[in-house]
């Protein structure tokens, strides 16, 4: 469950995601291959 401020960005492992308008989903994330 994602909880974020709409319009802001947040980290998901090594990727940066933009928060969706509902504050409960990612509108889009960078797709870098994160080291394990």
Curated annotation (Swiss-Prot):
Subcellular localization, as worded in the UniProt entry: Secreted
Site positions (Reactive bond): 31-32
Domain Pacifastin: 1-36
Keywords carried by this UniProt record: Disulfide bond, Protease inhibitor, Secreted, Serine protease inhibitor
GO MF, one annotated term: serine-type endopeptidase inhibitor activity
Similarity comment text for this entry: Belongs to the protease inhibitor I19 family.
Function (record text): Probable serine protease inhibitor.
Protein name: Serine protease inhibitor 2
């Amino acid at each position: 469950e994602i909880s974020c401020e709409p319009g802001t960005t947040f980290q998901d492992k090594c990727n940066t995601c933009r928060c969706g308008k509902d504050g409960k989903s990612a509108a889009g994330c960078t797709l870098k291959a994160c080291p394990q």
